[in-house]
Amino acid sequence: MKQTDDKDSLLNRLLLSLGILLFIRMGTFLPVPGIDHGHLEFYIERHFRLRTLVSTFAGDNTVVVGLFTLNIFPYINASIIMQLLVSLLPGLSKLQKEGGAEARRSINSLTRLLTLGWSLIQSTSVAFYLKRALFEWNLVLAFEIVIWLTTGAMIVLWLSEIITEYGLGNGPSLLIYTNIVSSLPGFVKQVITESSGKVPIGSWLLSGFVLFVALYGIVLLQEGMRKVYLISSKQLNQTSLPFSGSSNLESGYYIPLRFNQAGVMPIILTTAVLVIPTFIYNLGLLRILTPLITLPVFVKSYKIIYWVSYFVLILLFSLFYSTIVVNPKDLSDELQKMAVSIPGIRPGVETTFYLKQVMKRVTLLGAIMLALLATLPNIIQAILSLSGFTNLGTTSLLILVGVILDLTREMRSIILSNIYYDMFD
Amino acid sequence: MLKNPFKKKSIADKYQTLIREINALESTVKTLTDGELRNKTNQLKQRYQDEQNLNNLIVESFALTREASYRTLGLRHFDVQLIGGLVLNGGKIAEMRTGEGKTLVATLPAYLNALTKKGVHIVTVNEYLASRDQTSMGQIYRFLGLETGLIQEKMTTPERQRNYKADITYVTNNELGFDYLRDNLALNIRDVFLRPFNYCIVDEVDSVLIDEALTPLIIANSVKTCVDKYIIASEITDYLELNVHFEIDEKNKSVLLTNQGTIQIEKILGVQDLYNPRDPWIPYVINAIRASSLFFRDVHYIVQNNRIVIVDEFTGRIMPDRRWRHGLHQAVEAKENVAIRQTTEITASITYQNFFLVYPKLSGMTGTAKTAEVEFDKIYSLPVEEIPTARPNLRQDLPDLIYKDEFSKWNAIAKECQNISLVKQPILIGTTTVEKSEMLAQLLQEYRLSHQILNAKPENVRRESEIVAQAGKKGSITIATNMAGRGTDIILGGNIQFKVRKDLYNILVTYKYQTKENKKDSLSRSLQIFPLLKKLQRTSQKFLTVLNCLINNKQFLNLSDVEVLKILNESELIRVPKISYQCSMKFLINELVNFEKKTQKLDNVIVKNLGGLYIIGTERNDSQRIDNQLRGRCGRQGDPGKSRFFLSVEDKLIRLFGDARLENVLKSQLLDDLPLESELVTKILDSAQKRVEERNYELRKNLFDYDDILNKQRNVVYYERRKVLESESARIKILAYGEQVISEITSKLRRKKVFGSQLISRIRNLLGTKFLLNFPSSDLNNLESIDFQTYLLQEFWLSYESKILELEVEYPGIIQEFERTLILIYMDREWKEHLQKMSLLRDAVGWRKYGQRNPLSEYKEDAYKLFKYRGIVTRHLVIYELLRSSIL
């Protein structure tokens, strides 16, 4: 009894998580040596575009290039890439499915390597971007900056893994969470300053209401699921069938198919895809079309086209991604392997078909909700002309809600394993 | 996590000061008389009572134990053994090589911890070891004034209780675990065996806590089973083809029924759906296929007395009381056409993992723990310490030889045996299954090599000690399964003690019968029968005189053969016998031993010069520890020895867990008879083995994580149960239950909005009494919830009191027992039900991962709900039954 007691104490875990988050937060403001921040500030005051760049890194309006400037983002990108690779490369997906602890370890170390690569790229780009801002810029300094930032990113990765292992919550998601939350004050300020006086109270209330609805919708989206009930060989083998009297509902044998299997991935992918046209346009490849684009009709409809394609793409990516997360064929095979079946449906092809159909419906519902939630703020913004509202995008909201839900679940799980200690009266 | 590599001191350094202090005390202790030594025990006990700190007593108690051991057994603990004792006392695992005297080491912490008067348990893996250790080591404790106990399978309740009350109890893990479970099913406090746990030393700790971790201890009662389905399902398998109708997965020991297979079976059986809950076939079919294609006779089980007996994979021994679960055992019985025994229903169960964690202080010893260090640390919080050997280890582990296929491997083994046997070096060949050991025996027969075979077959088990005793003899070849692992001590040149005992037994028994038949002058006549005696006549006349006295001793003549054997076997363990004929027999043994010693010594030297015991492994086991156990049979106490593993590309380990590409390369490159001997391949094999170990570790870790919840629930239930069991009267409990039940009922009915006369009838149904008879239903609706509850409570108290009075009048004095038993019975019943639900839940939550839910968290969530539900149902049943009960 004793050895689990202190390991699973909620308070200890909470304190550890908070401590590490605080440490990383502090590290973000710890200036990288060699960079003259006076020069930087001077430059930034003149070049607003860079200001947005630097501040987005740290999550608020600092002009410090800190040790942990890259934060957890290299890792996030790396794991997204890894996730895609796993689902696309048959060798890797086989490794993940069949291998045990060792496979998990090798995938983890691959992700870490990718993180290292990504941080190198990202820190190099920062180093070269700073060339314009710093007088004493030279290759040695650039090299140093790369080393500092990459090291910082790797330390953050290590700390985040410690949170996952010994603390409360999942390290990387908690870090993203803190980054989003730390940008909230700035966001509110921005909204207030940019729309002060122009907006009536009514729109404020309305937008508050919309925010509430959006949050509610997100929770529903995250938690909503369709239970596919199962009947297992083991259950049938139980001699006195404790559940035989009641229906299957009580048995606990079910597959929960979530409305939103894919999480925030569809939005991220969509955003990434939608950047491409702008990018191409900026490259000047479409110069021939310029007269066409600048036509007033087109400018007006451009936004609409953008949002429609945004909506459609999210829908498509959701559908595509959910089949990656849960493949009906694999699921059906797994059911057959474990001698478990869906009542009334024959194992094998019939089950696959059934699952495919159920999943299609469930995901479609979830995808529509997701797409609606993602485009909603923009529509609101357009209607109420509350600028800055989009900054708190649905992605952020989804992450915030997701992290909080995960946290509560983890806390509940810890409480539920310790609850029995209180039963010795 | 953060460990300074420079800070890590060697184990010897760590305990240096303590060892020095113990050694310093030795001369003082030596001067004490026996009586004074014994007196010291009482002093130490008193000091513990005063100080409540064992650490202050370590030095003195260790010195005392060492001296007592020297005076009783003639064995003085080496310094490394003292280190072992300190490690054990520190609640850690001591890794000690074979033959380093683990049993003696255990006496040090056992004595020390017994000073608390709270009892010490020394757990061994089998009864023979328990009784051997208790008889020999018991002398030390007795000398020091402590009681020892021994638990054996056939003991009665009072015997068990008495033995568990002893200061130090030797017991097998099996018995101990089951006694714990039985204690928690007892309906009367008088039937409880065990005291609260204090300290435990587990011998062969890796076997108990790791190899057996996945097999839970189960107390079950049989339920009526329909055997037809097992038989029909078994017959169906004849009409199924591998890879057409079903597929097998050797790694996970599971089978998959294909669509074609499903259709085929449905056609044969003439049913629509195998999963039909009203007429389920699928579990029977799956089990039948598993039985026919994954479980083999003489590999996984043997057939003995018309029964299926499981052969344990790790120890190679049969497990007569163990049965496969979930209908698999019945399926195997159907396959082998033996009587199908009834299925069982778990009434109580616990895993060794959780059972041993009940001890506030736990320690263990084994020869092979280092490779499982992480597991011991993570699951049991038991650090592993390697104890240095008293003498340097001379064993030589030769690199593995890898052959192209099984055929050339076995041939190579036989040839190797032939070559080695030319110089008469003793050989021990370890095989993994009964089947393979017999196959190899046949092969050796063809090569005309005489050999002994040791496996789980009953005829071989009977000769086990004899085979082992001779395994170290010049020129002997022994084929064994994993049985020749733990606790097998092979002495080079043969074990004379064993030979002497055997010879003497034959002599004594013959004479016993002859004197009984009044053939006076038998001794001189029958010298002819035993050539040994004739030889002895020349060297020791005294032997014959004593023998003559002995066979005229009335007491001796009254002994049965078995008793003679027992005395002979124990004579080595007991140094100072008490009864006269025991003395005589001891003398005879010593005399014979002395006589044989010269030849034995010579043999020993010869075998040592030949290079000691040569161990041949025929296949890598799933775990490195098991291989090391086999290797550890040679090179004991600084003897020379060699070990080599002969492997083939077709071995299970390589086939299932190796690299497919490597396999192909090896297969194409290897010539028929030429082996590959390369460090690289050995390394690859090591990593494959590591992978298997890791997989199994994951399984056990997973089991542990899930079982942890059930264990916490079990602790709560057992605690509550124990309190009821120990209480004078369960009256308070009943009243508390009553209050809870009433508040649960009322709040539930309120929630469901049940009013009026319906409410009255519902409550009457739920409580089983005539409550509320004189209560107008209209008034009910106007009552506040709290008033309504108070009213019901009053009614409950009244009915309860009247019930007690009623019972007291009819059967005076029965009420307390009645109440207690009532609660206990329903607790047990609902716990049993709960266990079944939890076992299903464990299975069910696995599917939740498809909703990106953590199965463990989901398990915790649902387990808590089930647990709460269990409590509610128990309370309701108790109150319902109590209020309804009428005098019969």
UniProtKB/Swiss-Prot annotation, chain A:
Gene3D superfamilies, per the entry: SecY subunit domain
PROSITE patterns from the UniProt entry: SECY_1 (PS00755), SECY_2 (PS00756)
Gene Ontology CC terms: chloroplast thylakoid membrane
Record GO biological process: intracellular protein transmembrane transport; protein targeting
SUPFAM superfamilies: Preprotein translocase SecY subunit (SSF103491)
Family of the protein in this entry: Belongs to the SecY/SEC61-alpha family.
Protein name: Protein translocase subunit SecY
UniProtKB/Swiss-Prot annotation, chain B:
Keywords, in A-Z order: ATP-binding, Chloroplast, Membrane, Nucleotide-binding, Plastid, Protein transport, Thylakoid, Translocase, Translocation, Transport
Location in the cell: Plastid, Chloroplast stroma; Plastid, Chloroplast thylakoid membrane
Predominant location: plastid
Entry keyword Ribonucleoprotein: no
Residues at which ATP binds: Q81, G99, E100, G101, K102, T103, D489
Any GO BP: protein import
SUPFAM superfamilies: Helical scaffold and wing domains of SecA, P-loop containing nucleoside triphosphate hydrolases, Pre-protein crosslinking domain of SecA
Catalytic activity: ATP + H2O + cellular proteinSide 1 = ADP + phosphate + cellular proteinSide 2
Membrane topology designation: Peripheral membrane protein
Record EC number: 7.4.2.8
Pfam families per the UniProt record, alphabetical: P-loop_SecA (PF21090), SecA_DEAD (PF07517), SecA_PP_bind (PF01043), SecA_SW (PF07516)
GO molecular function: ATP binding; protein-exporting ATPase activity
Cross-referenced InterPro entries: Helicase_ATP-bd, P-loop_NTPase, SecA, SecA_CS, SecA_DEAD, SecA_motor_DEAD, SecA_preprotein_X-link_dom, SecA_SF2_C
GO cellular component: chloroplast stroma; chloroplast thylakoid membrane
NCBIfam families with a match to the protein in the record: secA
Function as written in the Swiss-Prot or TrEMBL entry: Has a central role in coupling the hydrolysis of ATP to the transfer of proteins across the thylakoid membrane.
PANTHER family cross-referenced by the UniProt entry: CHLOROPLAST PROTEIN-TRANSPORTING ATPASE, SECA INNER MEMBRANE COMPONENT OF SEC PROTEIN SECRETION SYSTEM
Family as reported in the entry's similarity comment: Belongs to the SecA family.
Protein name: Protein translocase subunit SecA
Organism: Trieres chinensis (Marine centric diatom)
